[in-house]
């Protein structure tokens, strides 16, 4: 199969939405029957985002094969059916690590290792490998044109443009076209300078995606076309919209997919965007609203919980309600108590690391349990629910996780002592082990207890979900917790590890050690999130009565 490559760059400012634009184009091409994948090339020196602060970088998205990747890969999976893997995201740090490892082995036969050709060749190899087996591979280059960090990636795609030829490569550049209120007009000069910068390193864009808070007038598009040496039909206006799921239709209406298909000489059907039209209709026509309290520690940056936010919205679509997320700092719960938890239709405690704010999450789980309020715990959210239950129901005073209190008399949650590395080798781990890449990661089979809420949600006796954690339920206390009324509704493939818990005599109190948000999509939703929002809606209706 001959793969075509679309390289996506960004200029003027960061955070223009390259990932959303790339995913939206991929969605249209997929709707035309093409097999599409997307890659993200990140220019930072970290090997992966696994140890980066969520308040700086946003969430870490975990793929099926256990790669810790950029949150943009979450956008990719929500827009297209293709599942991402570790080949779909790599960083400058990863490239340098692999090149230096080869140098130490002597693979370069004593050559002087340089950015060109050694680093650029390694980048090109990864891009070509990531695109194998697909009709089209869209490659997003992180950062902004002009940044020194991005230069090796830009040089690599420039070389690929020459090596593969125009019939297999296309360069798409996102840029900002701001509106100046004082002048009453949009300004094209930033775009002209951004394209000039791109051309100075040997890349001539074939398509310009012009971002702004309004549609760009025809005369300004003609001006951009003239000064940037791009066909006028390839100057695409991408205005701000109230839903990212409207963007595929917006790009389709301007013929972006036709331009791509014609450029690559592909024979394919017209795009069928009916599924996206249905999503947009559901989003615009809810029959009610529910308020979900998300109790976390990274709430100053909502992108730290990007996939959870989106999964809640998807579940709202399936239940025909709009979901309002109330972000609650778990430290505020510690300071003010349950007064900040009033007026909610459900509580969700997402994943997290570190001791800060953990007691607030435990209090949130207690409030939900005692007040019969729907509760959904994810990863750490399951662990705090179990700790709360152990302390206040099972009689294990001061029960805790050894992550937060190594001297606890009841370590109901403890460190996983074995893990499997990328090569499949089993290694022993202890408290002093490296933090990066040393977690239980990726898709795992989970057996579900017959008759449980989990089994009802999944409509079966098993599920496959993605993990990212170092700590597990301590099996020593399982029997005692079960006797107190806790239900272990999900177990690992060997039935040795607890994957899900529920509470008896509660409308909906469900928690999982895994991260179901990573597999939720706007078209399909996710059974656990759907069940949670359905329970929240039912709770609200009971309160209204």
From Swiss-Prot:
UniProt-annotated catalytic positions: 379 (nucleophile), 515, 517
Residues reported to bind CTP: 14, 147-149, 187-192, 223
Activity control summary: Allosterically activated by GTP, when glutamine is the substrate; GTP has no effect on the reaction when ammonia is the substrate. The allosteric effector GTP functions by stabilizing the protein conformation that binds the tetrahedral intermediate(s) formed during glutamine hydrolysis. Inhibited by the product CTP, via allosteric rather than competitive inhibition.
Residues covered by the Glutamine amidotransferase type-1 domain: 291-542
UniProt keyword Transmembrane helix, yes or no: no
Binding site for ATP: 15-20, 72, 239-241
Gene3D superfamilies (UniProt xref): 3.40.50.880, P-loop containing nucleotide triphosphate hydrolases
Record keywords, A-Z: ATP-binding, Glutamine amidotransferase, Ligase, Magnesium, Metal-binding, Nucleotide-binding, Pyrimidine biosynthesis
UniProt binding sites for Mg(2+): 72, 140
GO biological process, alphabetically ordered: 'de novo' CTP biosynthetic process; pyrimidine nucleobase biosynthetic process
Residues annotated to bind L-glutamine: 352, 380-383, 403, 470
Pathway(s) it belongs to: Pyrimidine metabolism; CTP biosynthesis via de novo pathway; CTP from UDP: step 2/2
CDD domains: CTPS_N, GATase1_CTP_Synthase
Any single Gene Ontology cellular-component annotation: cytosol
Catalytic activity: UTP + L-glutamine + ATP + H2O = CTP + L-glutamate + ADP + phosphate + 2 H(+); L-glutamine + H2O = L-glutamate + NH4(+); UTP + NH4(+) + ATP = CTP + ADP + phosphate + 2 H(+)
Record family assignment: Belongs to the CTP synthase family.
Subunit organization: Homotetramer.
NCBIfam families on file: PRK05380.1, PyrG
Protein name (database record): CTP synthase
């Amino acid at each position: 199969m001959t793969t075509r490559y679309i390289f996506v760059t960004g200029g003027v400012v960061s955070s223009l939405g390259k990932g959303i634009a790339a995913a939206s184009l991929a969605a249209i091409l997929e709707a035309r029957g093409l097999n599409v994948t997307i890659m993200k090339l990140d220019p930072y020196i970290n090997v992966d985002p696994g140890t980066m602060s969520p308040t700086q970088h946003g969430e870490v998205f975990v793929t099926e094969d256990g790669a810790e990747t950029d949150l943009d890969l979450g956008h990719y999976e929500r827009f297209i059916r293709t599942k991402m893997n570790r080949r779909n995201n790599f960083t400058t740090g990863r490239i340098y690590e692999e090149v230096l490892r080869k140098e130490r082995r002597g693979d370069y036969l004593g050559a002087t290792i340089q950015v060109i050709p050694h680093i650029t060749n390694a980048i090109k190899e990864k891009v070509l490998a990531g695109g194998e087996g697909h009709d089209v591979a869209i490659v997003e280059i992180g950062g902004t044109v002009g940044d020194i960090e991005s230069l090796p990636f830009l040089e690599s795609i420039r070389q690929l443009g020459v090596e593969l030829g125009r019939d297999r490569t296309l360069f798409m550049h996102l840029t900002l076209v701001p509106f100046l209120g004082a002048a009453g007009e949009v300004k094209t000069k930033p775009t002209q300078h951004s394209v000039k910068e791109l051309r100075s390193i040997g890349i001539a864009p074939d398509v310009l995606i012009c971002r702004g808070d309004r549609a760009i007038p025809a005369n300004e598009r003609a001006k951009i076309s003239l000064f940037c040496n791009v066909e006028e039909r390839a100057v695409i206006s991408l205005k701000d919209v109230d839903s990212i799921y409207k963007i595929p239709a917006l790009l389709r209406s301007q013929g972006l997919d036709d331009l791509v298909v014609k450029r690559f000489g592909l024979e394919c059907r017209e795009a069928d965007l009916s599924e996206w039209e249905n999503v947009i209709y559901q989003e615009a026509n809810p029959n009610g609203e529910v308020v979900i309290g998300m109790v976390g520690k990274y709430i100053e940056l909502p992108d730290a919980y990007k996939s959870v936010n989106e999964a809640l919205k998807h579940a709202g679509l399936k239940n025909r309600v709009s979901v309002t997320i109330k972000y609650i700092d778990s430290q505020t719960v510690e300071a003010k108590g349950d007064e900040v938890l009033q007026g909610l239709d459900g509580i969700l405690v997402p994943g997290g690391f570190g001791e800060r704010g953990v007691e607030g999450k435990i209090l949130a789980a207690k409030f939900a349990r005692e007040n019969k309020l729907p509760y959904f715990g994810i990863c750490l959210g399951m662990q705090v629910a179990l700790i709360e239950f152990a302390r206040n129901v099972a009689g294990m005073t001061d029960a805790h996780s050894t992550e937060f209190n190594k001297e606890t008399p009841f370590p109901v949650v403890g460190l996983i002592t074995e893990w499997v590395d990328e090569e499949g080798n089993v290694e022993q781990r202890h408290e002093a082990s490296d933090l990066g890449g040393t977690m239980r990661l990726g898709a795992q089979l989970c057996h579900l207890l017959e008759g449980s809420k989990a089994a009802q949600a999944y409509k079966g006796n098993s599920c496959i979900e993605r993990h990212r954690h170092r700590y597990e339920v301590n099996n020593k206390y399982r029997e005692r917790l079960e006797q107190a009324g806790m239900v272990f509704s999900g177990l690992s493939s060997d039935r040795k590890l607890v994957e899900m818990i529920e509470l008896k005599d509660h409308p909906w109190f469900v928690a999982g050690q895994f991260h179901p948000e990573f597999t939720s999509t706007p078209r399909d939703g996710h059974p656990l999130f759907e069940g949670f929002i359905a329970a929240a809606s039912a709770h609200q209706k009971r309160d209204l009565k």
